[in-house]
Amino acid sequence: MKFNFITLFPEKIQSYFSEGLQQKAIESGIFSINTIQLRDFSGNKHNRVDDTIYGGGPGMLLRVEPIHKALLSLGENKGIVILTSPSGIPFHQGIANKLKETGKPLTFISGYYEGVDHRVAEHLVDMEMSLGNYVISAGDLASICIADAVSRLLPGFLGAGESLLDESHNYPDVLEYPQFTKPSEYNGWKVPEVLLSGNHASILAWREQNRKKIDPDQERKL
């Protein structure tokens, strides 16, 4: 699978995917990344890709022209085009699964400043996606998160296939069961005896009974 990133900061993207499991997966040919510097398509000597807003307003918008040219440079390899934007649909595990199943390349357009000329969303992208109801400093962070969530679903990325099935968010409104490692007791805090028993049926039953429900009231702790 291939991930394209149209960005002002290619080094941020490259840095994230140059270590850990991501690096190993790329070296193994499980997926590949391609970063496109948006400024290369600015069309002006100052390499500016943003401009003021028609009708007035604070800040600057990314222009449609350089984004269009960057997409054209990818040809048929652009696949599904995703604009990361605060106004996009909230990304979740179900979307990650669907994107992986398509097998198509994914091309991410990262938003910056006040956002992107609306004609990009209207004419050039397949999906607008957000990480949630909050604003981050650059769309690159969202692009990386989405690509990471999809890439780790690819065959061979993780050693154990079962680990994908047991993860949080594969079950609606339910999180992963509690997990423990050595020592079996620390500071008076003990690992449940059933997990030390070696009885796989009992362990499985305990895990199912102790899957954590999503608690909507956690904000009260703040």
From Swiss-Prot:
CDD domains per the record? TrmD-like
Query: Looking at the Swiss-Prot or TrEMBL record, what is one Pfam family this protein matches?
Result: tRNA_m1G_MT
Q: Which InterPro entries match?
A: Alpha/beta_knot_MTases, tRNA_m1G_MeTrfase_C_sf, tRNA_m1G_MeTrfase_TrmD, tRNA_m1G_MTases_N, tRNA_MeTrfase_TRMD/TRM10
Protein's UniProt keywords contain Ribonucleoprotein? no
EC number in record: 2.1.1.228
The record's subunit annotation is: Homodimer.
Report the function annotation for this chain.
Specifically methylates guanosine-37 in various tRNAs.
- NCBIfam families the UniProt entry points to: PRK00026.1, trmD
- In its UniProt entry, what is this protein called? tRNA (guanine-N(1)-)-methyltransferase
Which source organism does the UniProt entry give? Leptospira borgpetersenii serovar Hardjo-bovis (strain JB197)
